[in-house]
From Swiss-Prot:
Residues 34-97 form the S5 DRBM domain. Residues 1-13 have a biased composition (Gly residues). The keyword RNA-binding applies. Part of the 30S ribosomal subunit. Contacts proteins S4 and S8. Gene3D superfamilies: 3.30.160.20, 3.30.230.10. With S4 and S12 plays an important role in translational accuracy. The gene is rpsE. Keywords: Ribonucleoprotein, Ribosomal protein, RNA-binding, rRNA-binding. Pfam families: Ribosomal_S5, Ribosomal_S5_C. The N-terminal domain interacts with the head of the 30S subunit; the C-terminal domain interacts with the body and contacts protein S4. The interaction surface between S4 and S5 is involved in control of translational fidelity. Residues 1-31 are annotated as: Disordered. The keyword Ion transport does not apply. One of its GO terms (molecular function) is structural constituent of ribosome. This is Small ribosomal subunit protein uS5.
Amino acid sequence: MPGQQRRGGGSGGSDRRERRDRSGGGPAQEKTAYVERVVAINRVAKVVKGGRRFSFTALVVVGDADGTVGVGYGKAKEVPAAIAKGVEEAKKHFFKVPRIGSTIPHPVQGEEAAGVVLLKPASPGTGVIAGGPVRAVLECAGVHDVLSKSLGSSNPINIVHATVAALRGLMRPEEIAARRGLPLEDVAPPAMLRARAAGVGA
C-alpha cells in the first residue's frame, strides 16, 4: 500500500508538469514569431512635491528577419513593462524593406535629428558590418550582408531612427527602372539577375 501511494504521487507530479508544459507552450511560441532587440534602456526621474518618481524608457526593434521591421519606444515604471510597450509600439510601425538576397538593392543614406547612417550593399558572406544600434535594425529586418557607417551623432536613439530612415529610402530595381524608363537589366545589380536566373526571388 505505501508503494502504491508513492506511485500515485509520482503520477500526479508528472501530470502537473505536463499541465505546466502545455500552459507555457503558447506564449513561448508567440515570442519566437518575431526577433526582438532592446537597443537602449534609460531611467527617467520626475520631480514632484513628495520627491522624485522614477520610470524607465526602452527603445525596442522588432522584426520577422524576413524583410519586415519596426521600431518602438515604451515608457513604464518597470523595465519589463517598458520593453513590452516598446514591442507593441514597434509592431504598429512595421514596414517592408526591399532586399536582394541577403543584402540591400543600392547604397542609401538616412538622417534623423543629428544621426546620419550610410548603408552599402555587400557580397554574400560579408556579414553585418555595423555597430550595435544599426546591427539590431538590420538583423531584425533580415539583412545579413551589408556595410554601414555612422556619420553623425553617437546617440543610439538617433542612430536607430536614421537607420530606419535609410531603409525606408530603399527602392526596388523595378521601381527605379519604371521611374527612369529603362529596362530592368540596365538598373538591376548582377546579383539580382543571377538570383532570378537561379529561381531565387529578389
